[in-house]
Design a protein with these regions (language model features):
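Active-site acidic/histidine proton-transfer and metal-coordination neighborhood
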Residues: 1, 11-118
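A broad structural signal for short, well-ordered beta-strand segments within beta-sheet-rich domains
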Residues: 1-2, 143
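Histidine-acidic metal/acid-base catalytic patches
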Residues: 29, 78, 82-85, 104-108, ...
């Protein structure tokens, strides 16, 4: 069963709305063909500057949108929401590193400007400067999808120090196997139960394989992640 799918839109750039919303419409065709109640996962298209500065949105507000940019963002997001709902799908918004919605105040702004639900991604939230557990407490009423990831903050510090970009962050292994990084996943699952969440949980480990690394290594990593979930989260 399809639980969701990534639908990037350059919300703050009206010149790209026609192209991006047409692509969203084609993606919704695939959702409809698959059946079920998959969630369109809206993500901001970001910019070259944000992609060159992963994790910096939480500490440098100059990388963010100005007021005109936020007005365009709100209008673009409204159009995407209407398109999804007109086709029978309830969307969610994914705060994601290297986009214009990464830091806690950027997430607050999206929730203030729209009625869209929120996807809580433990990895991207931590990279952007949010506490995933506090995110559930602050935004729990809007959460309608969850991504479980773990993150190595030592890798993030190196990426920021070296002014490395998003692809380099992935290649360095910023996202790691569950239980081997710095996300308090045990505490997160405890809070997830406390807020009564009963929706989809998607387990992810974003990575870029080396040329000499077989695809089977990714499969083995997911088996280890599955074992961690059974032991620590009872899933």
């Amino acid at each position: 069963m399809l639980s969701g799918g990534w639908c990037p839109v350059r919300f703050s750039e009206p010149a790209h709305w026609e192209e991006d919303l047409a692509e969203l419409d084609r993606t919704l065709d695939l959702f409809a063909a698959a059946g079920g109640t998959a969630r369109p996962v809206f993500g901001d298209g970001g910019s070259d500057e944000r992609r060159a500065n992963p994790g910096r949105g939480g500490e440098d507000r100059s990388l963010g949108l100005d007021e005109a940019g936020w007005r365009h963002f709100a209008d673009g997001l409204r159009r995407a929401e209407e398109l999804a709902r007109d086709r029978g799908f309830e969307p969610t918004f994914h705060a994601h590193t290297s986009t214009f919605v990464e830091a806690p105040w950027e997430i607050d702004r999206v929730l203030e400007l729209s009625g869209v639900g929120l996807l809580v991604d433990t990895g991207h939230l931590l990279i952007g400067g949010s506490d995933p557990i506090q995110a559930l407490r602050d935004w729990g009423s809007r959460v309608n999808y969850v991504h479980i990831k773990d993150v190595r903050l030592d890798v993030l510090r190196g990426v920021v120090r070296d002014h490395a970009g998003a692809i380099e962050a992935w290649q360095r292994g910023i996202f790691c196997e569950l239980g081997t990084g710095d996300v308090d996943l045990d505490g997160f699952f405890h809070e997830l139960r406390a807020v009564g969440y009963d929706g989809w949980i998607c387990v992810e480990q974003d990575r870029i394989l080396r040329d000499d690394e077989p695809i089977s290594e990714s499969a083995e990593a997911q088996r280890r992640n599955r074992a961690w979930l059974r032991e620590h989260a009872g899933l």
